[in-house]
């Protein structure tokens, strides 16, 4: 008999719940390397074994924040286990989300191109 797959909506719901719970849990982490962190998104594997957690930070060095989050991953996993009502709580893999930085750079390049075009006209 084929294994029953969970629906894509359930995957999204669980990812959203993990995002909300991690945001709450990060407020309780006392590591000074973790400044103001925003969890941008969570992507789950279909079997819920792994979660890619994308974050941004307003303060501090993103690399130091990544190291601190990776160090705290075990604790965060245990706390998620207490909050989530699913059989498997995923292993957390943190990734710095560069989307905002890329958007700012693209905006700067567009502004620069428009300024150059205005000078030529």
From Swiss-Prot:
Coiled coil: none annotated. It is found in: Cytoplasm. The keyword Cytoplasm applies. Its main location: cytoplasm. SUPFAM superfamilies: Ribosome-binding factor A, RbfA. GO terms for molecular function: ribosomal small subunit binding. GO terms for cellular component: cytosol. InterPro entries: KH_dom-like_a/b, RbfA, RbfA_dom_sf. One of its GO terms (biological process) is maturation of SSU-rRNA. Keywords: Cytoplasm, Ribosome biogenesis. Belongs to the RbfA family. Monomer. Binds 30S ribosomal subunits, but not 50S ribosomal subunits or 70S ribosomes. One of several proteins that assist in the late maturation steps of the functional core of the 30S ribosomal subunit. Associates with free 30S ribosomal subunits (but not with 30S subunits that are part of 70S ribosomes or polysomes). Required for efficient processing of 16S rRNA. May interact with the 5'-terminal helix region of 16S rRNA. This is Ribosome-binding factor A. It comes from Paraburkholderia phytofirmans (strain DSM 17436 / LMG 22146 / PsJN) (Burkholderia phytofirmans).
């Amino acid at each position: 008999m084929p294994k029953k797959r969970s629906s894509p909506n359930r995957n999204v719901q669980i990812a959203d719940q993990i995002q909300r719970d991690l945001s709450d849990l990060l407020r309780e982490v006392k590591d000074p390397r973790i400044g103001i962190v925003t969890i941008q998104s969570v992507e789950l594997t279909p079997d819920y074994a792994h979660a890619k957690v994308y974050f941004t930070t307003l303060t501090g060095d993103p690399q130091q924040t990544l190291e601190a989050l990776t160090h705290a991953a075990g604790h965060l996993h245990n706390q998620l286990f207490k909050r989530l009502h699913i059989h498997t709580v995923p292993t957390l893999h943190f990734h710095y989300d560069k989307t905002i930085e890329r958007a700012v750079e693209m905006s700067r390049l567009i502004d620069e191109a428009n300024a150059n075009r205005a000078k030529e006209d």
